[in-house]
Structures are given as structure tokens and as C-alpha cells.
Amino acid sequence: MATEKTLDDLFLDTLKDIYFAEKQILKALPKMARAAQSEEGKQGFLHHRDETQGQIERLEEVFELLGKNARGKTCEAIQGIIAEAEEIMDEFKGTAALDAGLISSAQAVEHYEIARYGTLIAWARQIGLDKAVPLLQANLDEEAATDKKLTKLAETAANPKAKKAA
């Protein structure tokens, strides 16, 4: 018979998931920056790469609070989102719609991360892991801010540029 799993186990499992996801995102962001056509898009992806490194470090602190080694668990969701981004980079390379596609991929990543961090914060509170909350909240706040920046970039530059080319 399987051993009973608890919210603590689910928290650790989800922490491993987002840790893996952040590491994959860290690898994908330079490719997205190189593919972006606008300078603002390139700089945005590079800035988020630097933020992502800080987010990984905060996640490592949460692992330390748990007395566990920082270790990821394959996150198929993020692998799928990154694969879609790579598809967009291939299919729309050199077109006016590329940046709009890259932004939409980046926002899919952000929304996944926002969902994960929100859940982890709620669970950390529930299991009494109060010292993890500010670390996770800092990551959530950065993800939400990035999502807002991406929306602004899409609405003011990338989407109109993609539409004009039609």
C-alpha cells in the first residue's frame, strides 16, 4: 500500500517542478532575446534572464529551509511552452509577427509561473513554512511585473507592427 502523501509532500513536489521550470526558462531566454527583432524585446528578455537567476537562488533558499538539496523534477508543462516558443521562432523568423509571437510565448511562461508561485505561497502558509513566503512572494511579484511589461510591449509595439504587415 502506498504511503500517505501530505501537503508537505505536495509542496516539495511543486517546488521541484518550478525549480526545474526556472532552470529551463533561464536557458530559453537568451535564445528568445537573440530571436527578438526589437531592441526593447531583446533587452526585456535579457533583463528577465537576470531576474530568473535571482528567482532560482530564492528557490534554493526555500529548499534549504526544508533541509533538502535543490533538485528539479521534470516539468512537462514548461517544456511544452518552450517547445511552442521554439516553433514560433522557426515559423515566424524574419516576419513582423515574430515579436508578438515571442511575447505570447513569454506570457504563457509567466502565467504558469504565477499560478505555481501563488499555490506555493498558500501551501507554505498552510504548512507553517512562514520563512519561505517572502522568498516565494518576491518571485511572484517579479513574474507579475514581467507579465505587465510584456502586455505593454505587445499592445504598444509588437501587435501593431504585426498587424501593419498584413
What are these regions (language model features)?
Residues 1-166:
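Amphipathic alpha-helical hairpins
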